[in-house]
């Protein structure tokens, strides 16, 4: 890349791409390089968000941390941003520690796509800090839920991105 093409956008895009290769390589034998990936097609249907997803977000929004987490299989994996949490209870405990330490959240579903064993969600989360001197933010979210092969009603692996919350 020559100097005249280096913009803030290309710099941010390049910086954002760096950790993706290592996350992909560490996740369920997913190849780090596209040339190593077997390509396939999948049909998605845009539909209303299912009850399990709404119940999960409600547990976080209400800070109740209960049955909404039952959408995850017992040994589910979550990679939310830089997290690497293993097990339903670890997912619950780590989200609780993150949210309870400083803000109240409200999740808003904008669109939900059902692709069978892969569910895709896009929306926003309003994050209101407990400290009134801090500003409320509303970052975008995108989440991929890979459902369990044996029990397709349970999430086996969750990949999610939220933010950035500030620049």
Regions found by a protein language model. Give the residues of each.
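Short, low-complexity N-terminal intrinsically disordered segments enriched in polar/charged residues
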Residues: 15-66, 70-71
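Short beta-edge strand/loop motif at the mouth of beta-sheet-based domains
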Residues: 85-93
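Charged catalytic carboxylate motif
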Residues: 10, 48, 52, 90
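N-terminal secretory signal peptides and thylakoid transit peptides that target proteins
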Residues: 2-18
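A beta-strand edge to alpha-helix "cap/lid" segment located at domain peripheries
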Residues: 30-43, 79, 92-167
């Amino acid at each position: 890349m020559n100097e005249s093409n280096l913009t803030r956008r290309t710099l941010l895009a390049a910086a954002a791409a760096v950790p993706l290769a290592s996350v992909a390589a560490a996740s369920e034998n997913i190849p780090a390089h596209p040339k190593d990936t077997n390509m396939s097609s999948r049909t998605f249907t845009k539909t209303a968000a299912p009850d399990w997803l709404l119940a999960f977000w409600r547990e976080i929004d209400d800070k109740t941390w209960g049955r909404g987490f039952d959408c995850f299989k017992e040994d589910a994996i979550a990679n939310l941003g830089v997290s690497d949490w293993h097990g339903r209870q670890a997912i619950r405990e780590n989200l609780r520690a993150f949210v309870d330490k400083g803000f109240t959240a409200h999740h808003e579903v904008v669109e939900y796509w059902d692709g069978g064993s892969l569910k895709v969600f896009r929306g926003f989360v309003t994050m209101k800090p407990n400290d009134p001197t801090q500003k409320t933010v509303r970052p975008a979210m995108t989440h991929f839920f890979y459902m369990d092969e044996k029990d397709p009603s349970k999430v086996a692996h969750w990949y999610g991105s939220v933010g950035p919350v500030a620049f």
